[in-house]
Amino acid sequence: MKYMLSVHTCEGDVRPAMSAEEMQQSWQQITALESEMKSAGAWVFSARLHEPETATVVRVSNGEVLTTDGPFAEAREHLGGFYVINAQDLDAALGWAAKVTRCIGEPIEVRPFAGTSED
């Protein structure tokens, strides 16, 4: 079954400044985790996203398509990135989410894809 692991970040949260060496170690941990996911057949896709200010919302109103600069909702928390994974069940997906949050230090929301029971 496919799951989305959403990486949530909080605008304005001050994270400790990382030295170049610490940043390199962090990327090595993420790379190692993604390699582990790939070896286990869990990794499908992952991506980081730009800040919410770079978003554009497209919607229909009275039959007309409108675009608005900025995020869909003004909120302190926003989607910073995501993983799409294959996992046997929720417990397995939660196990991967635990590894991701340990690696990056951000909360992870785990949700199954609708309409699929395997893949």
Give a label for each model feature:
Residues M1-D119:
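Conserved, structured core segments of small domains
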